[in-house]
UniProtKB/Swiss-Prot annotation:
Described function: Regulates ATP-dependent protein translocation into the mitochondrial matrix.
Region of interest: J-like: 58-110
Region annotation Disordered: where it falls in the sequence: 105-125
Subcellular location: Mitochondrion inner membrane
Pfam families: Pam16 (PF03656)
UniProt name for this protein: Mitochondrial import inner membrane translocase subunit tim16
Assigned keywords, A-Z: Membrane, Mitochondrion, Mitochondrion inner membrane, Protein transport, Translocation, Transport
């Protein structure tokens, strides 16, 4: 009886291991394809995400912005920063998340402006 139970457990772990390996390979392939599709800006953006510890999508969700417009980002940042101020009963943790999100979006806008400048220069010459 114990022998069969051990065999069932080993086979179950093998199945889970294979599924995990397959899922991991698919995730790596999807990540690589997405980075290649976005080109150089995608590589820079991924590097910034890994350095800042926050993804672009997460930063957009925190500040509740869909498009990267400086006015909307600044408006939402100021509102969320004031609302989460510790002196008015807010959370320092949430306030720091808001700051990190704004920093990440600012970095992304810098990357986009750098990639747009060479395109503008090539069209003018």
């Amino acid at each position: 009886m114990a022998k069969y139970l051990a065999q069932i457990m080993v086979m179950g772990m093998q199945v889970v291991g294979r599924a995990f390996t397959r899922a991991l390979r698919q995730e790596f392939a999807a990540s690589r394809a997405a980075a290649e599709a976005r080109g150089r800006a995608g590589t820079e953006s991924a590097a910034v995400s890994s350095l800042s510890g926050i993804s672009l999508q997460e930063a957009q969700q925190i500040l509740n912005v869909s498009k990267l417009t400086p006015e909307e980002i600044q408006k939402n940042y100021e509102h969320l920063f004031k609302v989460n101020d510790k002196e008015v009963g807010g959370s320092f943790y949430l306030q720091s998340k808001v700051v990190r999100a704004k920093e990440r979006l600012d970095q992304e806008m810098d990357i986009q402006s750098k990639t747009e400048k060479p395109k503008d220069e090539t069209t003018q010459t």
